[in-house]
Design a protein with these regions (language model features):
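Alpha-helical DNA-contacting segments of helix-turn-helix folds
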Residues: 20, 55-62, 70, 107, ...
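Amphipathic alpha-helical segments used for helix-helix packing
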Residues: 98-115, 163-171
Length: 199
């Protein structure tokens, strides 16, 4: 066990993020985080009173990363049209959800009440704001009510894809081999997003 001189809180969060992605949030505990960070079992309690506090921090980091990825997808090429940026953002969202499945699951898990964690709520809102901005750009003059409805509809579409493919429910329902559905969806995702936008 090492004597810690650096930023203990940041190291604990990093360890928690690693464990969450590798094994899922069910396998996270303050003790397992301490072991991963190679510090005493009491060390995490200096920064996190409960496991939920730590889960909220991991979830917040996930939303911050998602917002960053969506922003990068939207701004990667200044010559892209708003429609093209929307499609790239949708692709980036699904890719994030599939490649970081355990973190993604925690981000949308009901075990954390976002209302109890203002910074987590702000991070989640920031990620959703990226969708709001592009939908508003695609629909000049759209009312707030219609903007909300469209954003929720498009979010539900990509969120549903992540859930179906990530849990292999598509494979089971259509009789394909494990992993085939993911390849199909990834290959045709941009076409799907184009149709979703025109729906």
């Amino acid at each position: 066990m090492k004597y810690h001189h650096g930023n203990l809180k940041e190291e604990l969060i990093s360890s928690a993020c690693n464990i969450c992605e590798a094994s899922g949030h069910d396998h996270m505990s303050l003790r397992s985080i301490a072991k991963e960070a190679n510090v005493s079992q009491t060390a995490p309690y200096r920064h996190f009173k409960t496991k939920e506090d730590l889960l909220a921090e991991v979830s917040k980091r996930g939303f911050e990363k998602l917002a960053e990825i969506l922003n990068q997808a939207s701004s990667q090429n200044e010559n892209m049209t708003a429609k093209e940026r929307f499609i790239e953002m949708g692709f980036a969202y699904v890719k994030f959800g599939l490649e970081r499945k355990n973190t993604y699951d925690l981000m949308h898990s009901p075990i954390i009440d976002k209302a109890d964690f203002p910074e987590l709520l702000e991070a989640a809102s920031s990620a959703f704001d990226e969708l709001i901005k592009i939908i508003a750009e695609l629909n000049p003059g759209i009312s707030d009510a219609d903007l909300s409805r469209q954003c929720i509809r498009h979010w539900a579409q990509v969120h549903g894809l992540v859930g179906l493919v990530g849990d292999t429910k598509i494979d089971e329902s259509v009789g394909t081999k494990a992993g085939d559905a993911m390849s199909i969806v990834t290959k045709d995702l941009r076409s799907f997003l184009t149709m979703a936008l025109d729906f």
